[in-house]
């Protein structure tokens, strides 16, 4: 075969062109590629203005990297933050696992100027099930005229072609005026990792010098403690406990457990009750928790087709009124079987997230009628089990759902604690969470969080469980919930292999496990939550006192770059244990002592959870 230079030249040119194109593409991706249309923030239409009596306009801006901004004025409250929002479809493809950075600037204030403005940034699928790669809240600076730069690093949860995903800016956080400018979303592909972008964002946004004031004499709720959900039998497991659950029972202080009552397996036919498979696993769970002196909540997710109808795991199904008696009898038989055959009791019962419909959906009026019928049947069977009030999907809508139940005096004898899930903690208004505490005080009811977590869609993200981001955001959700709602009990979702705290084989704890352990040590049963405030909006502070005389603690969470704080209001000359958790290492302990004024200077590493514990 004879090969000449002339015959090779076309192939060489093709290879050279391909190399040049590949090099250019790599350089372009390493520098980042915008996934939004040009000026999309300024040309898109804000939807749902009528739902909050809102107005939107473009305003001129000086002294910033952008010359125009979107101003949105919200004049009314809405039940959901997406009632008024701007959605922007992406204009470039994105691959699962790509690292992206969103940047925008925000300024404004709530109506009356008493609080910062608030919005939420989301990157999500454009259609149901609205898979979310990120949902990040943002507050403006305290000065409504000051622009605040916000960086949101994240990784893509799925593959998307143009138009298949969108950026959503949610504005319905109560009456407020806010301005947003300089929006960009840059995709770095695989040239940078999400962790690298997270570190970069923290570096560009240092906390700096701060102060935190503790008022140990200003106390609130008394902590019942921390616990968890043990719901794998509800999802089909025939074993009561997996390796993750066993590890957590051994290494965490579990003060309460919530299990799933698998009604679909317990009563597959009307009048038939089977103590086998998933139902038996749940009954064995109750027995084991009773043996450990851990009180139990039993909640229902799914029901049998003959009772509830529809498809298995279908959302939003309403139990027909003519089936109330059948359902009540089935639940009663389960609780009696636990008592008489397993020697175990259930303190409280609920339907999981009945407001949202997972999977039973009840209006408050329907729930009141169900309880009105079930309460006497429980009592006739000799059961002391009471109903949780609410057990709602989120905290923002809890008060609207629970108040009618509390106002119905016919069911008052059958009601237990006010209960909600804090999945919306990082996006809900402070006022919405504070209203939960107010409702508890009004009706003299304890408040519990039956599912504690920060993102109900986290399972959609690529391997999020081992990340420090998961641990840090869990701490933020716990702090806000405890500080505002008056919750005395936090039940993590879950202490089994579902949103796991440790590896599946139960041998390797994840960072989030260490965070839970750190917080439960700082906020033990019997401690009273005490007031604490920080000089910087991003720094979170929570204090407690007791249960022993002279015992106190402070929880500090810094979600941005490194800084320092001076803790004020602590006992003078007190010996303290300082515990620091960051992405690279968790629960690193050292000793310190407050000065004669009760001050303590602390370094706060970037993206850290820090606890200070003082003992008599």
Where are these regions (language model features)?
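Extracellular polysaccharide-targeting segments
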Residues: 29-42, 149-159, 172-210, 214, ...
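Secreted extracellular polysaccharide-interacting domains
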Residues: 51, 72-101, 116-120, 125-138
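Short carbohydrate-recognition loop motifs
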Residues: 58-80
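Extracellular carbohydrate recognition and processing domains
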Residues: 128-162
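Substrate-binding cleft and catalytic face of glycoside hydrolase catalytic domains
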Residues: 214-217, 251-406
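Aromatic/acidic polysaccharide-binding cleft in carbohydrate-active enzymes
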Residues: 446-523, 527-538
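Carbohydrate-binding surface patches
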Residues: 534-574, 607
């Amino acid at each position: 075969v004879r090969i000449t230079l002339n015959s090779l030249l076309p192939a060489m040119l093709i290879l050279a062109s391909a190399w040049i194109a590949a090099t250019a593409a790599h350089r372009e991706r390493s520098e980042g590629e915008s996934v939004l249309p040009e000026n999309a923030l300024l040309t898109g239409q804000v939807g749902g203005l009528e739902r909050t009596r809102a107005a939107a306009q473009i305003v001129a801006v000086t002294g910033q990297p952008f010359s125009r901004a979107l101003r949105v004025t919200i004049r009314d409250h809405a039940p959901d933050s997406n009632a008024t929002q701007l959605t922007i479809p992406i204009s470039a493809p994105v691959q699962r696992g790509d690292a992206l950075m969103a940047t925008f600037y925000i300024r404004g204030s709530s109506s009356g100027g008493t609080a910062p403005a608030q919005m939420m940034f989301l990157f999500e699928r454009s259609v149901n099930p609205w898979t979310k790669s990120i949902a990040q809240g943002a507050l403006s600076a305290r000065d409504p005229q000051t622009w605040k730069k916000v960086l949101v690093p994240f990784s893509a949860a799925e593959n998307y072609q143009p138009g298949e995903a969108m950026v959503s800016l949610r504005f319905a956080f109560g009456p407020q005026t806010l301005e947003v400018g300089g929006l960009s979303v840059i995709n770095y592909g695989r040239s940078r990792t999400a962790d690298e972008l997270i570190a970069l964002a923290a570096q560009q946004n240092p906390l700096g010098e701060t102060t935190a004031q503790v008022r140990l004499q200003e106390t609130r709720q008394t902590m019942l403690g921390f616990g968890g959900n043990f719901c794998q039998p509800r999802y089909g497991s025939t074993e009561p406990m997996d390796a993750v659950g066993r590890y957590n029972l051994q290494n965490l202080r579990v003060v309460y457990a919530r299990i799933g009552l698998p009604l679909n397996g317990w009563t597959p036919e009307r009048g038939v009750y089977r103590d086998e498979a998933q139902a038996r696993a749940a009954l064995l769970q109750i027995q084991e928790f009773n043996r450990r002196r851990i009180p139990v909540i039993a909640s229902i997710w799914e029901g049998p087709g003959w009772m509830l109808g529809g498809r298995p795991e279908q959302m939003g199904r309403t139990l027909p009124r003519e089936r109330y008696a059948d359902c009540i009898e089935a639940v009663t038989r389960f609780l009696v079987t636990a008592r008489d055959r397993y020697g175990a009791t259930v303190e409280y019962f609920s339907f999981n997230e009945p407001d949202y419909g997972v999977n039973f959906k009840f209006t408050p009026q329907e729930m009141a009628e169900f309880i009105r019928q079930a309460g006497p049947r429980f009592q006739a069977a000799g059961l002391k089990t009471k109903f949780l009030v609410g057990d709602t999907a989120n905290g923002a809508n809890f008060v609207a759902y629970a108040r009618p139940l509390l106002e119905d005096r016919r069911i008052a004898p059958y009601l237990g604690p006010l209960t909600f899930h804090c999945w919306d903690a990082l996006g809900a208004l402070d006022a919405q969470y504070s209203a939960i505490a107010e409702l508890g005080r009004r009706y003299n009811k304890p408040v519990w969080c039956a599912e504690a977590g920060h993102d109900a869609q986290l399972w959609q993200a690529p391997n999020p469980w081992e990340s420090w981001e998961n641990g840090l955001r869990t701490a933020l959700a716990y702090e806000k919930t405890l500080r505002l709602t008056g919750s005395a009990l936090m039940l993590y979702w879950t202490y089994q292999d579902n949103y796991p705290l440790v590896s599946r084989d139960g041998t390797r704890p994840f960072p989030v496990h260490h965070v839970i352990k750190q917080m439960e040590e700082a906020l033990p049963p019997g401690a009273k939550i005490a007031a604490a405030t920080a000089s910087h909006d991003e720094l979170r502070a929570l204090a407690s006192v007791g249960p022993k005389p002279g015992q106190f603690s402070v929880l500090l969470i810094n979600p941005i770059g490194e800084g320092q704080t001076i803790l004020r209001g602590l006992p003078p000359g007190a010996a303290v244990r300082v515990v620091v958790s960051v992405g690279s290492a968790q629960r690193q302990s050292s000793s310190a002592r407050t000065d004669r004024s009760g001050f303590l200077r602390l370094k706060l590493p970037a993206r850290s959870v820090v606890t200070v514990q003082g003992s008599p």
